[in-house]
Amino acid sequence: MRGGSVFGRCVVVGGAGAVGRMFSHWLVRSGVAVTWLDVAGAGAADGVRVVAGDVRRPGPEAVAALAAADVVVLAVPEPVAWEAVEVLAGVMRPGAVLADTLSVKSRIAGRLREAAPGLQAVGLNPMFAPSLGLQGRPVAAVVVTDGPGVRALVELVAGWGARVVEMPARRHDELTAAQQAATHAAVLAFGLGLGELSVDVGALRDSAPPPHLAMLALLARIAGGTPEVYFDIQAANPGAPAARQALGRGLVRLGQAVERGDEETFAALFAELRGVLGEHGAELERLCARMFTALH
């Protein structure tokens, strides 16, 4: 480590993926010597060394890179990360930093504490698609095993311009069940509903009011993404089933109020929703107005 806040050597496992490339880009800009350990073994970014291999079964070159690293970033799916932890615990030097980028933190945090107690460990979850850019966007940070290396890495990410939000693993998963699992489920269900209604999207687009246009845009973005990423968010988060069930119950309550012709109950739902938003309602309403101004 150089200067106590800048790492000398880093291995990004799964560097060829979008998240791995984003971290690699910023690490290289910070003067860090970055090595990718990736099964693809090709398509490296500028300034990055590539070692082809599987982190679960690393060859001699991969072992040497991992052993020399100040920090290892696991930008891989959860099943791979789960197996890799024990391997890395036996290869990385004591006190080095292991950072995962998984979208669910409770399980991997427990795994790290159990299988890699000698490593400093932190979970980093960029709460945005890497293509949007990091500047000003939130990165959730779950400190598993604290130490100077973890502090240096968190400070480094903040120095890149990210808005780092630290929280415990359980809290992270509770929040992302609402932020990601419920949100994605609502948008996907909206799209499935459009398909069932057999409506022409072009006609919808031509006369769409801002809320509908925003939903169409969200649907297009998610549907154009990688299914495995969205499946992992729905399947791995322990709070996702409850989030989907809550959405379903909300639709039932809405439908019941309308079908019964009960305007008082319908109005009460609006009052309930204003209570959910609380003191943040006015600010979020202004944000929505700015978003809608840009939609046309």
Swiss-Prot record:
Reaction catalysis annotation: 4-amino-4-deoxyprephenate + NAD(+) = 3-(4-aminophenyl)pyruvate + CO2 + NADH + H(+)
Biological pathway: Antibiotic biosynthesis
Alphabetical list of Pfam families matching this protein: PDH_C (PF20463), PDH_N (PF02153)
EC number: 1.3.1.121
Record flagged with keyword Oxidoreductase: yes
Keyword RNA-binding appears in the UniProt entry: no
InterPro entries, sorted: 6-PGluconate_DH-like_C_sf, NAD(P)-bd_dom_sf, PDH_C, PDH_N, Preph/Arog_dehydrog, Prephen_DH
Span of domain Prephenate/arogenate dehydrogenase: 9-288
UniProt KW keywords: Antibiotic biosynthesis, Oxidoreductase
Any one of the GO BP annotations: antibiotic biosynthetic process
Molecular functions per Gene Ontology: NAD+ binding; prephenate dehydrogenase (NAD+) activity; prephenate dehydrogenase (NADP+) activity
Top class in the EC scheme: oxidoreductase
Stated family: Belongs to the prephenate/arogenate dehydrogenase family.
Main function: Involved in pristinamycin I biosynthesis. Probably catalyzes the formation of 3-(4-aminophenyl)pyruvate from 4-amino-4-deoxyprephenate.
Protein name: 4-amino-4-deoxyprephenate dehydrogenase
Gene (name only): papC
